[in-house]
Amino acid sequence: MPGDSPNALEQGQTRAERIVERILGLPEDELADEYARLLSVLCGRHRDVEKVFLQRYENARELLRGSFSASGARAKLIGAYFSEEYAYQSAALFNPSIVRHPDQSGCPPGALRFILSLRAIGEGHLSSIAFRTGTWQPGRDIVLDAASPLAATPRIEYPESDDAAVHLHCDDSRDLSETVLFPILERQRGGIEDLRLTSLEMEDGSTLFAGTYTAVGGRGIAQELLATRNFIDFKMHRLEGLIAASKGMALFPRLIEGRYAMLGRHDNENIWLLLSENLHHWDGGIRIVNPRWTWEFTQLGNCGSPIETADGWLVFTHGVGAMREYCIGACLLDRSEPSRVIARTRRPLLRPSPEERYGYVPNVVYSCGALLSGNDILLPYGVADSFTAFSTLSLDALLAAMD
């Protein structure tokens, strides 16, 4: 809704009410011409644009307490005046996480389809969650599917209480690249950042794609949980507990001794192990990894959910060193007792190259997850908070490089 100035000349009406009044007073021929012009501009860029206009018309009526009524093109034009386009990835597309695609049909032998989640930044440094799909065949190319030029607006079911989940229905998306999860709540008004997605095996044997992200609100940050079973219907649920007001939490992909497990960094310096019987409530924890090498002296955190291997839980880490240079390393945790660190990398696996030092935030390489297939690892990572690149490495070689 357009805001009101305290210096407005007209008193007794809001600016929004004055806009509606002007549209209601338009002669039919002017109305028809303006609406036709608007459709000619927008229909090639958006799908079901008239449906969006009608929804915005209903939103405007609700916000203005039903003080007006219109139908047909006039109602849609009112909706258009309370709409705007937003280039959600115009500034950056980075900090990816990655999971196996639930549909592996049609994949070449030995290949793997995957889903990337990405942090997209648009005008005003506002972050949202975007998705891409692709195919990876170890030893060969990584092929990203062509992204749709369109983005679809989800249908939103708001909760009755602040503690309940928000439901997002993205059935209008014809391709996953059209699905954009935008900040929609007051506690997310500064953006939603760095989704760490994993494939979580539930107690009943089913799979839930779930991950934490950082909600940036007017009063600070907090961790929230995104969950879906089909990448069409999503739930956004706030996390509770003493460490919910932090960044960089990452779920283990299965329960450990009957409890959910999470890595966190609620002291802004070390990696902690957290266990909980409630997926949405997290307290306490044990500090398990602390800064040791020069490239991680400032702080240490995870780069996504742990990956289970025969040798232990593989955790990619990020370390911050001099000049706030972000590098990527790794450590290995015991499978049955993940509070025990078996080994870790003395030197970074990835650090910003000369070509990667310049961007929105210089001197940064960062990831929110990796994918293991056999002995091969696919590690997508963000560069300088600007774009996304990919690296591949051997699990055996990585473990051999640890101390």
Language model region names:
Residues V315, V365-G369:
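Extended, compositionally biased non-globular segments
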